[in-house]
Amino acid sequence: MGRERTYHIKQYPLEKGALEIQYIEEFFGEFDRKKTATEIQKRLASRDHCILMAEARLPDDPSLVVPVSFKVSHEIFFEEQDPHLADLVSRLAGAIDFHGRRILYSWIGGTRSDWRGQGHFRALTEQQESWALEHGFKEIVVKTKNKFYGMRATLTHLSFDVIKYERNLLDNRDSKVYVSKRIGPEVLSRHQSERTLTQAV
C-alpha cells in the first residue's frame, strides 16, 4: 500500500490573497467572468473570510511549486447592504436558517484542469470546514450552475446537500444549484485528507 499523499495548503491575508486569486483565475476558461483583486478586496474587507490555496510541484520540474486549486469563502448576514449579497440571502429564504447562526458562503474556487481528480479540492474543502468550525460557523453554502457537472459531483461526494434549484427556462444548463453542509465536530471526524497549513506573509 502506497504512502498517503500530503496536500500543502496556504492561507492568505486579504491583500496578497486577492492578487493570488486574480492570477490563478486566468487558468479557468470556463468562468464566465473573472474576479479582479480590487473586487475581491471590496467583497471581503468588512467581513470574516478565508482565502485558501493548494500548491503542488510541476511534474516536469519538481523544483517549481505552483498554485493548483483555490477556495474563497466569507460570512453572509441575514441583513446585507451589498445588493448582490442581499439578493443571494433573499434567494436562500426558507432554505437556510440565519437566526442565531453564523453562515459561511463559499464564494469562488476551483482546481486547474491538469490537477483535477487528485484530491486538492477535497483537501481545501476540509481545511475550509476546519476553519469554519473554529470560527463558530454552523453551515457552509455554495452556489453553482447545473452545467458544472464535475463540481456538482464533487460537492455531492463531499456530503453537500441540494437546498434549492432555480431553473433557467431558456437553458437548463444555466440553472442555479444551491447546496449546503452543516458544520460540527462530527464533520471533522470524517475528513480524509492529510494536510499541512502555512500562513502566507
Where are these regions (language model features)?
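Short amphipathic alpha-helix that is part of the acyltransferase structural core
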Residues: 1-67
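Short hydrophobic/aromatic beta-strand element in the GNAT-like acyltransferase core
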Residues: 49-55, 70, 103, 108, ...
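Conserved acyl-donor/pantetheine-binding loop and adjacent beta-alpha core of acyl/acetyltransferases
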Residues: 61-108, 169-171
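Polar/charged side chains located within well-ordered beta-strands of beta-rich proteins
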Residues: 71-73, 106, 125-129, 155, ...
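Conserved GNAT acetyl-CoA-binding A-motif
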Residues: 102-103, 132-145
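Conserved acetyl-CoA-binding loop-helix of GNAT-fold acetyltransferases
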Residues: 111, 117-130
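Conserved catalytic-core motifs of GNAT/GCN5-like acyltransferases
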Residues: 141-144, 156-177
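C-terminal "cap" of GNAT-fold acetyltransferases
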Residues: 167-201
